[in-house]
Structure formats: structure tokens, C-alpha cells
Amino acid sequence: MKSLLVLSLMLSLSAWAGLKVGTYNIRNFDYDTREDIHTNKPELAQILLALKFDLIGVNEINNGEELASFIKSKMPSFQVMLTKCGGGNGQTLGFIYNTTKLRLIDFTEELGVTNPGGQPTCRANSRPMAVGTFENLSTKETFIAYQVHLKAGSNAEAYEIRFKQYEYLKNFFQNAEAEGKTSYIVMGDFNTTGYLDRDQDYKKFSAMLNANNLTNLTTSLGCSAYWWGGTDDNSEAPSKLDHIVVSRDYLTNKGASHRAQLHGHCKKVACKPASSEDLGVSYQEVSDHCPMTVEI
């Protein structure tokens, strides 16, 4: 009986100490001017609450004050922290986190990734990288979370810029590790448009991960977003743009066990080509992307 009680206590402590992290590009929250669509907030609330996350990185937040107000009303134990800069289109990024599980120690934004090799800038080019240092309140361990949103597009110019961003990130993380910042998570919209085709984009992205001993915890997930596919055939095509990767030390400290999950319309249609109607409200009125989570 005593051994069972000890085992039960160990399991409960393990469950408390573990974290569920995620990433979600919430397409131009809370109003997408390109599509003239206001974010369907009741649908978004259902999506976020169902994730049961402790920490989620978010992208394309055009109205940070509205997001903070929305989260406060729907998830009162959570807080929002976003970058001030959002690139040329004002798409800020950052984190939503559970204050009963995590304490935010420090938050900065890394502008160098906006224009690798050139002058970093806040209001043009790509988005910055959000950098949050968190403490797990149950274990007192600290880790760094990075949220990225790299250059979009599949043309040669977009690829060239994104390849420079991969190189920048490779050097950035190597320098960070040299400074002792070895336990970290990198997540977000890497915009790896060539990932499913296994083209040069996939190879450059993978090379960046390998150079830094980063493990992609979401390789088993078949997609993370949908787009029109280049033809007007009423069939939207899946793509794999978003990822959650971790450093070797973070994975070693937390244990190798993890479970990746895909959510939203991507899960609904199992990453197969589908019509906008089949993808449903989350695709039409919230985001083309789907949230993904990992329990570590």
C-alpha cells in the first residue's frame, strides 16, 4: 500500500512538473484586412481552451491589446506578452502562458532575424523573434522559449531571405549556448513552404536544426496549415509551416518522453486536401494555420 501511495505521488508530481507547449499562428488577429475577415472569437476561445496548454507561442497578432483583453476574459489565469515590433505588416508575436505554472522572468525581442546581414529594423522586412525566459513554478527550473515567424513565400527571393534567416538562427543559438543558455524551446511559423516537398527549403531548415543539435518534436505531424493550392478547384492544400523544436539539454533535463498533437481543421481532415467547407469555421474565420502542441 505504501509503495502504491509513493508511486501515485510521484506520478502526480511528474504530471504537475511536465509542460504542455504549443504554437499557433492566429491569422492577423483580430481583423484580416486582406480577406476582410474579423477573427471569430467564440470559435477561437473554444480552440484555445480545448488545447489545455501551459505555454503557447502566437503569431500574426495585429491587435495586442484586444488579444490581452480577450485572454483575460476567457482564460483569467493566463497572461499575454508580445513584441512591440511586427515587421512591415505589424504582425507581432509572443506568448500566452499559465501564471499558475510559469513565471515570466524576462522578455526581449531579437531584431537581427528581421534582416540578416543588413540593418535590423522594426517596421519593415520580416518579424523579430520573441524571447521569453520562464521559470517552472513546480520545479524552479528555468528555460528559454523562442517564438519565430520567418519570411513567407515559395519564390526564389523568399527562399533566399529565409535561407539567410536559417543561417542567422544557427549562429544565434550557437552563441547563446556558448553563453550557457542551453535549455530552450524554439517554435513558431518557420514558413517552411518546401518542407513537404523535401526540397532545398527542407534541407536548409533541417541543416540548421542538425547544426545546433535541435530535435524537432513535431515531425510526426503531417501538416500545420492550409492554402488554396495554386488552382481554383475548391480543394485547399496542406502545408507544413510550423514546428516545435527543443535543445538537447532541454530534452535531457525533461526526459525523452513527449507527445505531439495536431488540432483544429488539420486534425479534422487528417491533413488531406479538402474544401474550405470541409475545413470549416476554424479555417474560414480564425486562421489558415492549426495549433500544434507537445506534452513534455
Identify the function of each model-found stretch:
Residues 3-13:
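Sec-dependent N-terminal signal peptides
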Residues 15-91, 161-167, 181, 265-272, ...:
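N-terminal, active-site-proximal structural segment of metallo-dependent hydrolase catalytic domains
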Residues 20-23, 54-60, 81-82, 93-97, ...:
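Structural recognition of the beta-strand scaffold that forms the well-ordered cores
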Residues 31-33, 64-69, 78, 89-92, ...:
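Extracytoplasmic/secreted cell-surface and envelope-processing proteins
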Residues 55, 60-142, 146-150:
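Structured beta-strand-rich core segments of catalytic domains in phosphoester-bond hydrolases
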Residues 175-185, 192-296:
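Metal-dependent phosphoester-hydrolase catalytic domains
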